[in-house]
Amino acid sequence: MSTPTFTVADIRKSFLDFFASKGHTIVESSPLVPGNDPTLMFTNSGMVQFKDVFLGTDKRPYKRATSVQTCLRAGGKHNDLENVGYTARHHTFFEMLGNWSFGDYFKRESLKWAWELLTEVYKLPKERLLATVYAEDDEAYDIWTKEIGLPPERVIRIGDNKGGRYKSDNFWMMADTGPCGPCSEIFYDHGAHVAGGPPGSPDEDGDRFIEIWNNVFMQFDMDEQGNVKPLPAPCVDTGMGLERLAAILQHVHSNYEIDLFQALIKAAARETHIADIETPSLKVIADHIRATAFLVADGVIPSNEGRGYVQRRIVRRAIRHGYKLGQKTPFFHKLVKDLVAVMGDAYPKIREQEARITEVLRVEEERFFETLANGMEILDAALAGGAKVLPGDVAFKLHDTYGFPLDLTNDVCRERGLSVDEAGFQTAMEEQKNKARAAGKFKMDRALEYTGDANAFTGYQKLAEAAKVVALYAEGSAVQELKAGQSGVVVLDTTPFYAESGGQVGDQGVISTAGARFAVEDTLKIKADVFGHHGVLESGSLKVGDAVQAEVDTQLRAATMRNHSVTHIMHKALREVLGDHVQQKGSLVNAERTRFDFAHNQPVTAEEIREIERRVNAEILANTPTDARVMDIESAKATGAMMLFGEKYGDSVRVLDIGSSRELCGGTHVQRTGDIGLFKVVGEGGVAAGVRRIEAVTGENALAYLQSLESTVDQAAAALKAPTAELNTRIGGALEQIRALEKEVAALKGKLASSQGDELAGQAVDVKGIKVLAARLEGADAKTLRDTMDKLKDKLGAAAIVLAAVDGDKVQLAAGVTKAETSRIKAGDLVNFVASQVGGKGGGKPDMAMAGGTDASGLPAALAGVHAWVAERV
């Protein structure tokens, strides 16, 4: 039977249509950044968006689902990056076809529908297909052999082959405990002419038998002892790689030969000017443009940490392969339009964000190209000596100075049959961290040794608390007593003081007894559940065991709470106004203001800032109550609360609802949104590539800021003698008048230069056939000096000229040499001869140079020496 040819677009559509006809709801691909699991770096399978359903913490309005999911495997446990470009089937980014049953159908329907789609829709030859089942899964085996009719010799039982009970290629587990079950994989046989054996055989890693579809049957719940019991509602989770299936249906062996990749490879060849489209580096570039573009679309900007660093590694790997092909200027970002052409219909978000994606990649590309050549020279020099291992310190220098991720250096070395001393690299990295720690001013809490009990935190409910001193520290060491005037750290058994965490600064206040007063200047965590109160004992003495009263500075706490609460509301507004790609990159919340760093690739416009302010202040006016609930992490995920990637959350978390915002947060907050009072953005700017910063104030500080602006406006209006309502018009008129006067001044200076040129020309002295002139011009600026110089050179013919102007102690110099004389005299040398005597230096072209100086007293002698200086050189 002849297998028809399907394009990638055909496969996506036919897959979804098939399962829709079987009662499945078509579900849109979720982002590459998982929204329900901050511990997972990237979405790496189709089931990620349904994880909460499988865990029983979420329900959907459907029991059958199908989707085409974008996936990424380039970081953490699931990392295919180093293999991309070297094999036929490894990718960073790929698409996963899948169908799911949530307590509805089970093995029979799943396997029969898979067989129907493959053999009747895609027309794959039945004799080319075989399946594996878990050795103990007789039900799946019987469905394959007795109901579908697959010959027993083409249904392979796979047992526990990974060193333990239920440890098998054909037994799937979500985690060490919880939902699990057997799976059945479908393989395609490329034929005996291709090397490799069937699954389960010693030669199974060959290319003959290729897995195309995995059907996972979640029918058990595993406990901590490894025992399983049946789930009340078994589920089905299947996944089939789109690129692998396309290669089979398009009658090619490598995924890179399918229509989608061929279009991208040809585009990469166009931009790198390479004729041979079989070049492996083109495959790398074609793969990486998919990964990087979709990452940007989902809010991941190149950076030096977390997901952003994985993005940076992929971008720079693609650029390095282009450089290897001879491309010395930015090219990678130009492929975005080609990607949109082949994938924009299936994923409209990349078409909608095409300009933004292109710009993000362009900025990153230009940044790396600035250092790439120098880095490659160092790498080439290090490898030229014939050593088989690149020293770790060299790899670290490439990383630290030239922005070479370690895997990029590994990539280059592997191409040359060499390896990298990764242990040496890590040693160099650790040494740098130690130096940074030693050079920095670290707070005392980092070095304190505390072995006592955790303290109770009562600061959500109270601002004052009776407590007992359980530990004291002075100069980093434990002591039994602090005396008046000593700085130290106090640890209490219970405290209302909030310790610095999550961007919120620590509380200030007072710890006191009848005879002692300790001023708390900051509160920091010694351990996760032990707070250190840093400050100075202003009077009396304080001993371990003393009963004390701990009181938080209520005004500072209230102001800090306003700023922290508004940060949550602002974060929500930023995502609504700028887009879902906005992700928090850092924050600082204190009593003065809130500072919020977020992923966004361009300045926030004045109109956008006004809309953000409008939305936030609307939430404040609504005066809705704040609600904080403590729950387990899985329940929190089910509520849709925003979580930050990289944050370590415990089993129990605090979910904060404030306005329309819902986030995990352990900070202190206002009781109602109206307590914030007023919100005003006071600053916006860039802090790194793809990261913007907004600063804002609230409450009394916002009012003070607006009153200050009003005062400035009033002063400007008074100076211009205009009502504030007419200020813009009056300023516009004044600017027009200034521009007109500037034109008049420029014209007068031009006339002055012309007249001075006529007068000065007569002062030139002939030195061996060259007219030499050194003179001072009164009231001239740099432009007047240059204009006068040009007129003098025209008048004098062969000439060497120095002109000077003085403003206070500052000297401006211009030197000019007619072109015919530049072989003997350089204007730069001439101007520096004079500049060196007036405390300055300069430079320029052989026929014109400028300089400045700071010692006008040396100018007369310097100008007087010009004639002799020229005479020595002609």
Swiss-Prot record:
EC number in record: 6.1.1.7
Domain of life per record: Bacteria
Keywords assigned: Aminoacyl-tRNA synthetase, ATP-binding, Cytoplasm, Ligase, Metal-binding, Nucleotide-binding, Protein biosynthesis, RNA-binding, tRNA-binding, Zinc
Essential cofactor(s): Zn(2+)
Positions that bind Zn(2+): 564, 568, 665, 669
Main location: cytoplasm
GO cellular component, one term: cytosol
Main enzyme class: ligase
PROSITE patterns: AA_TRNA_LIGASE_II_ALA
Domain topic, free-text comment: Consists of three domains; the N-terminal catalytic domain, the editing domain and the C-terminal C-Ala domain. The editing domain removes incorrectly charged amino acids, while the C-Ala domain, along with tRNA(Ala), serves as a bridge to cooperatively bring together the editing and aminoacylation centers thus stimulating deacylation of misacylated tRNAs.
Record's protein name: Alanine--tRNA ligase
Organism: Delftia acidovorans (strain DSM 14801 / SPH-1)
Gene: alaS
